[in-house]
Amino acid sequence: MAGERKTGETNPDAAERVLAEYMARYPCGDAIRTVDRMCNLYSMTKSQAAIRELVKAMVDRTGNLPPLPAIFPNRMAPVVRDGAEGRELLMMRWGFPPPNIPGQKPRNPYLTNCRKTDSRYWQTYLKKPEHRCLVPVTSFAEPDNNQGPKSIWTWFARDESRPLMFFAGIWREWEGDRGTKAAPDVGTHLVFSFLTTDASPDVAPIHPDATPVLLLDEAAREQWMTAPWEEAALLRKPLPAGALKIVASGSKADEA
């Protein structure tokens, strides 16, 4: 999801040339090419008991989890992973750190989506089932093609009742500051991102660039969490037409 370019920002064509040169030298740099114009807003309004029941999570570390009608990058959100004590539900912060690019400040400090799964940066985690996770979601939002501050946000869910879905996610530990200049948050953080793929037929008329990889049934969830990467990678495909419905429009929160 890209905003309007402000005065003084780098010319996008020049920046693309610099990035292309960097990626030729440092292959992991391609991880940041597709972070813009993707899913950077979603909701999770079901109970933690509902999540645990679907994914058979035996451990719950979320405390008292409230409805989350608007989850933005760098916010805390519930995630399911396989831990030392079995499958667990816990809170993580949304967004991987970007690869370090010498002499260049990343355009986006948080990699919220993973599209180029052949990148060395992402392969470090994708190939290891212990670094894969399930991200509970009840709806997600995409902007229209305007892409500026006047963009209209459209919310997608399975139907009006917003049943649980899961993004195909990955997670890692990261040491650093995930706060603000006024309120630093320095320490060890658990962070997550999730996969995107080609826009599905339901999403493409609003947002043709991409759509999240969604896992709708137990077989798909278990394949993502346990299978070798060659098998898990088969899940990177858009849902068929009719799998998603538009359930809201205009607001940056899905309060239903």
What is the meaning of each model-derived region?
Residues 3-5, 15-256:
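Short linear sequence motif anchored by a di-proline
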